[in-house]
Amino acid sequence: MTLMNKALTIAGSDTSGGAGMEADIKTMEELGVYGMPALTCIVTMHPTTWEHSVFPLPLDLVEKQLVTAIEGVGINAMKTGMLGSAELVELVAATIDKYNLQNVVIDPVMVCKGCDLILVPDAAESIKKLLMPRCDIITPNTVEAAYLADMPEVTTVEQIKEAAEKIVAAGAKSVVIKGGERLSDNSAIDIFYDGKEFTEMAVPKIYPSYNHGAGCTFSAAITSGLANGLSMKEAVLQAKKFVTAALKHGFAINNIVGCTNHTAYRKYSE
């Protein structure tokens, strides 16, 4: 009998299929991991304006999903996505403690793509206080990194490294900060810091950028690598290759948005 390593994603459902739980499960499947979702909310989009509407699920229903996945099946790694409330963050933190969960990946999801505003301040503060000290790695973009590190902004490689040091000093075991297209040069730069050394991962920026779901895909790929027994650095490097291929071969799903291609790493990796 062939057994697969298992991973849990605690995230919202993106009805367009590009981000959230849908991106996570696709990524896990592509990397040979049995993925399980615990849905926190359902996100819908207006068909012509693409305006988002978020419908949270009751806290007790989220908890029942966690019990099913963790007690009923078992997990080798887990990640978070959109949590959306301080109460939900508290539930996740308590769950990590209750089951002594390992290989915990926190994707903070504090801002929407292209936005510099923290969406739910009380949830963001709870992530900072409760989940950051409990995680094996956290995967903020530069806006989220500035918030987590108590810095006014993070816009340069030097500031990314400073933020990374502060985030690890605040309790995270490691961090990878996604510079991506927010930095001003022509490279998409992510920087991994494990508390001892920095690893810069730079690839040319990809235009046009069909990047809906890129952050979710990246953190899910890290989670998958950890579930499969890779070291943290190995998991991060594999995830960078996976998401780069997904972006390079991204595609438009309508005339408003384009998504990462989750099959690209398998089909087109060179």
Features from the language model and the residues they span:
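Short pre-catalytic strand/loop immediately N-terminal to key active-site residues, enriched for Gly-Thr
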Residues: 10-16, 198-212
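Conserved N-terminal subdomain of the carbohydrate kinase-like
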Residues: 2-9, 25-113, 117-118
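Phosphate-handling active-site elements
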Residues: 31-36, 198-199, 225-238
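Glycine-rich beta-alpha junction loops
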Residues: 14, 42-43, 84, 110-112, ...
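Charged C-terminal helix
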Residues: 233-270
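Conserved phosphate/ATP/ADP-binding segment of small-molecule kinases
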Residues: 121-198
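Short, small-residue alpha-helix embedded
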Residues: 146-147, 208-232
